[in-house]
Amino acid sequence: MAVGLLKAMYQELVTFRDVAVDFSQEEWDCLDSSQRHLYSNVMLENYRILVSLGLCFSKPSVILLLEQGKAPWMVKRELTKGLCSGWEPICETEELTPKQDFYEEHQSQKIIETLTSYNLEYSSLREEWKCEGYFERQPGNQKACFKEEIITHEEPLFDEREQEYKSWGSFHQNPLLCTQKIIPKEEKVHKHDTQKRSFKKNLMAIKPKSVCAEKKLLKCNDCEKVFSQSSSLTLHQRIHTGEKPYKCIECGKAFSQRSNLVQHQRIHTGEKPYECKECRKAFSQNAHLVQHLRVHTGEKPYECKVCRKAFSQFAYLAQHQRVHTGEKPYECIECGKAFSNRSSIAQHQRVHTGEKPYECNVCGKAFSLRAYLTVHQRIHTGERPYECKECGKAFSQNSHLAQHQRIHTGEKPYKCQECRKAFSQIAYLAQHQRVHTGEKPYECIECGKAFSNDSSLTQHQRVHTGEKPYECTVCGKAFSYCGSLAQHQRIHTGERPYECKECKKTFRQHAHLAHHQRIHIGESLSPPNPVNHQVL
């Protein structure tokens, strides 16, 4: 019976490798962020359970990598040696090496000595152990395979595992023997053996079948996607069924996976367990921390195959690729306009809803986009972060700087299709095109007079209101138009920017120069514009 107990405990010892899942680099690259996060959670949870049960005394390399947010495929699968790992299942195609034979003999002796300390009978134990050893050798080629019953489940056992872990908690003090004095009674051995099998059964439910067994693939009946684990298939099928069994008790939102619910609940609790060691910024998800770390490292692992542009996140790459494909999968149900990314359609939909969630805390004005609020706040702060390198003039918006720089470059990218006249700004082109169309959309509500642009209407309305917002700082005289003030100020400065090319005579106003030039071309003189005289 001592031999039976020894073999049962030796064979049923659960190792970290028994519940670990390995990925190659190619397989890891195929997983999305949520799948990688689920894998990380399961592996870390399995490790914590084995530690709490006393089944692992050293930290495996894959756990160290996962805790650092690194990819687990960096770990090469090796046969772990020592009490932490115990024996690995050896495939039928692998031969036992002399080193493995020595390890088997060493472990046999170690267990015999342990049984001796518990005063168990083992008069012929060594011979029986050698004769019956727990490796079954094939004649001729010395190949071996671990005699272990492979247990599989058709249904995932995630919800039931916790209770089973507790039921085997009495074994946590020693990975080989119970802490209580072992009494060689058949019923006690049977009870402990059953508990250990139950615990291992639950762990086996979340790992692939042993490498000794033929790998059985499970296919989804809806999309024919293939899985190696029944639990993965069960999770996947919820995509088709729409089943979301995990519900948040705070807001009622439901999820198809427990890990997604745990992540969501951190919104309510404010928990952010993942902290950046560089800047101390904290995150609710490990995947978000991994993405953030690339800000410090500058790593951009996702590269566009078309233009070779690189990105720090796969989502950014996917969004960028739509520039090349022209794909616009997000369509507005109100007007049918399509967008290449989700954030753009969310912003666009506020046009229809009138939603303006971003409010200025100084004047209370609200905006549909955060960027609009940021630009607006510079009115209050006076901030002008965009400076022209040519003349030093600063602007509150980058677009205004871009428009201004065309003064220096002379660039006029907006061309009229009717007369081929070009403009530096699209607004100027739109205003010009009304010359050809005759459109005058801006009408004065006082007199009904219409104008082709809003600035002309604004200036005209001052005729009715008598408003003169432009005041000379020298003499205090006020004007309705900014241009009129500029002309007036030349009286004080003596500036005469308009010069006749024939006689070199200068003038304060362009209209006066035009009137003067008629002397040289022989045109009849006419009195200056009365408006200009009034300005002077």
Swiss-Prot record:
- From its record, what is one biological process in GO terms? regulation of transcription by RNA polymerase II
Q: Which Gene3D superfamilies match?
A: 6.10.140.140, Classic Zinc Finger (3.30.160.60)
What is the documented function of this protein?
May be involved in transcriptional regulation.
Q: What is its main location?
A: nucleus
In its UniProt entry, what is this protein called? Zinc finger protein 570
The protein's location, in the record's own words, is: Nucleus
Q: Which keywords annotate this record?
A: DNA-binding, Metal-binding, Nucleus, Repeat, Transcription, Transcription regulation, Zinc, Zinc-finger
Q: Which organism is it from?
A: Homo sapiens (Human)
Name the protein family. Belongs to the krueppel C2H2-type zinc-finger protein family.
What Gene Ontology terms describe what this protein does at the molecular function level? DNA-binding transcription factor activity, RNA polymerase II-specific; RNA polymerase II cis-regulatory region sequence-specific DNA binding; zinc ion binding
Q: Which SUPFAM superfamilies match?
A: beta-beta-alpha zinc fingers, KRAB domain (Kruppel-associated box)
* Pfam families xref list: KRAB, zf-C2H2
Where does the record place the KRAB domain?
Answer: 14-85
Example of a GO cellular component annotation carried by this entry: nucleus
